[in-house]
């Protein structure tokens, strides 16, 4: 659920930046609200990645998406919407995230991840820590009785399913933007993915928006260019392009 939430937020934010730049609105949307126009927009789901940019590329922070990571979004939703829905005081809810990355422990302590002194997520367990706890408790999953899946906020979509693989966030965000602008799903054959020669961990993709809904007519014919990388070598190369103003991506 929260992966879908992140995808919708990031996709909508990217669309807002494209609108502001291509419609010549400058730093405000049609309602006069401020809009970050920095392109390319960079995903903000990894706390380790955020820390790297803060230290190595502090002048490029405007390029980061304003979106929280999925598990901190979920924590915020649980302590607001879910708390209200169930009649529970937010202070009586304790949110624990099970994550594969130890940097998530640091992430939940950042000041951006709390409101009025209330953390979005109270604790993080790594998957390895959870596995140890399961073994210590002697839980035998093979012989546990069947139970119903608990989905208090609904199920996820296919876009959320690919979220965890390299490039999954980008593909999901592109799908969202394309569907918002055209009213149709993104045909996979229209997504042209190209590896960068000599750097296998970086790949680029482009999609040309051929037809649009009336309100997005200014995006007709626009080709959106994106890049995906795994590892800091490729990421640093892309960030250097951003820093020197030669990045061709959105």
Short names for language-model regions:
Residues 1-250:
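Iron-sulfur-associated redox domains of electron-transfer enzymes in respiratory
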């Amino acid at each position: 659920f929260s992966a879908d939430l992140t995808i919708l937020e990031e996709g909508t934010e990217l669309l807002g930046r494209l609108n502001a730049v291509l419609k010549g609105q400058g730093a405000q949307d049609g309602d006069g609200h401020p809009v970050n126009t920095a392109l390319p927009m960079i995903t903000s789901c990894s706390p380790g990645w955020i820390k790297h940019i803060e230290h190595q590329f502090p002048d490029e922070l405007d390029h980061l998406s304003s979106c929280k990571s999925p598990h901190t979004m979920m924590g915020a939703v649980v302590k607001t919407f879910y708390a209200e829905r169930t009649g529970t005081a937010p202070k009586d809810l304790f949110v624990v995230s099970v994550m594969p990355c130890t940097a998530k422990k640091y992430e939940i302590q950042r000041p951006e991840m709390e409101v009025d002194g209330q953390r979005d997520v109270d604790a993080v367990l790594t998957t390895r820590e959870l596995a140890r706890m399961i073994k210590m408790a002697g839980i035998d999953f093979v012989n546990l009785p069947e139970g119903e899946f608990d989905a208090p906020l609904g199920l996820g979509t296919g876009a959320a399913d690919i979220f965890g693989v390299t490039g999954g966030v980008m593909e999901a965000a592109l799908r969202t933007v394309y569907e918002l602008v055209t009213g149709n799903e993104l045909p996979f054959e229209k997504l042209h993915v190209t590896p960068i020669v000599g750097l296998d961990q970086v790949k680029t993709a482009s999609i040309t928006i051929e037809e649009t809904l009336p309100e997005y007519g200014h995006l007709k014919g626009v080709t959106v260019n994106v890049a995906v990388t795994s590892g800091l070598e490729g990421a640093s190369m892309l960030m250097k392009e951003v820093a020197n103003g030669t990045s061709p991506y959105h």
